Amino acid sequence: PDQVVYGEASAYCGAGDLKQLDTAIELCKAGKIEGIVFGPLHKGAMKMAGMHYESEHTYFAHAFDLKTPFCEVNMMDDLMTVRTTSHVPISEVSGMITESNLREAIELGEITGESLGHKPRIAVAALNPHCGEFGLCGREEVDVIQPTIEKVVKETGWNVTGPYSADTLFISALKGDFDVVV
């Protein structure tokens, strides 16, 4: 169509993305499909077309009237990753490392892992280099991440450990030491 200019975002293209998502949502709600898989979307174009949500994930959550925690879950073979933050500028990430957000991510990892038949081994990544070096290079690990892990383990008995330095955590995870990385 004339409305499409290769390499440029537009409201027309965003409306096409939204129409595809809406069709998939309708089919899922009608029980005609059991899941939705889609390729890359352009959030900017979708916003030009009138989407008022931060991401397609929030769009889905609203469409399905979801009240429980949700986020993008990525799978690679037997390894799952769950995000504590998502689709935010790096300058906002530290402020989003809260007990509530971290608990939601851990809970989602546990529930999703269990639904796949696992008793998941969950590893929580640090935010700062070298796990913050005991507060010398960032306090998120000391003030939020470690205490939250300890509370969750005490309250639930789930197999959650960390924080681990993010630069080396995936070596262990890909070797099979963990099922979920938060």
Briefly describe each language-model feature range.
Residues P1-E56, S100-V181:
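Contiguous, glycine/small-aliphatic-enriched amphipathic segments in soluble metabolic enzymes
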